[in-house]
Amino acid sequence: MSVILPESHPEHPFNLIPELCRRFYDLGWATGTGGGISIKMGDNYYVAPSGVQKERIKSNEIFVLNSSQDIVEKPRTDKQLKMSECTPLFFNAYRMRNAGACLHTHSVKCVLISLLCDREFRISHIEMLKGISNNETKKALGFRDTLIVPIIENTDFEKDLTASMAECMEKYPESCAVLVRRHGMYVWSDTWQKAKGAVECIDYLMGLAIQMKQLGLEWEPKDVK
């Protein structure tokens, strides 16, 4: 987010992060305090707190960090809040992809796909692919393109995923997402709008893929004209 918005603006991260957390909760992506959201504006990185009811986060409960991952402003509340455990992984996206936002979901569809696939989730010839961009070219995928989302193994603590996620991002420079087996997914993009659109499209495709699997349909059909 290149434009610096006043704190009263509905799209300022102080207001936007709680709104998106509520949306994610309603979708089943951030239940049980799970999931996370971070948005960059100017030189600051805004991060939701950890271990809280995501649908009840307030604008004064957001952490503000600098590019060195140092806290420059703590939440403006008396609550003893803890910064998101996802923070080092968000910064993978900021440092390696120059992202404007990074989203973390605990979607059931993502977890199921991580159990159905070995090292990658691949799907092609579905219209909703067009809502996802190639991370290198920044161009939207086409109907005949193949979406590839790599999968890394889960760890006991979120921070311990940092190195394996970074290694995976280096190996898959075109991908805007990484699946964590039995856990969830991280998605990033240049703006929060694009990141939101991408995670919605990928989640849709994963839900569709699960149903296709049940019907014996191929995720990468070879005979589609």
Curated annotation (Swiss-Prot):
Catalyzes the dehydration of methylthioribulose-1-phosphate (MTRu-1-P) into 2,3-diketo-5-methylthiopentyl-1-phosphate (DK-MTP-1-P). Pathway: Amino-acid biosynthesis; L-methionine biosynthesis via salvage pathway; L-methionine from S-methyl-5-thio-alpha-D-ribose 1-phosphate: step 2/6. Disulfide bonds: none annotated. Its cofactor is Zn(2+). InterPro entries: Aldolase_II/adducin_N, Aldolase_II/adducin_N_sf, MethylthioRu-1-P_deHdtase_MtnB, Salvage_MtnB_euk. GO terms for biological process: L-methionine salvage from methylthioadenosine. The active site is at E127. This is Probable methylthioribulose-1-phosphate dehydratase. It is found in: Cytoplasm. Keywords: Amino-acid biosynthesis, Cytoplasm, Lyase, Metal-binding, Methionine biosynthesis, Zinc. Substrate binds at C86. Zn(2+) binds at H104, H106, H183. It holds the Pfam family Aldolase_II. It catalyses: 5-(methylsulfanyl)-D-ribulose 1-phosphate = 5-methylsulfanyl-2,3-dioxopentyl phosphate + H2O. One of its GO terms (cellular component) is cytoplasm. Gene3D superfamilies: Class II aldolase/adducin N-terminal domain. SMART domains: Aldolase_II.
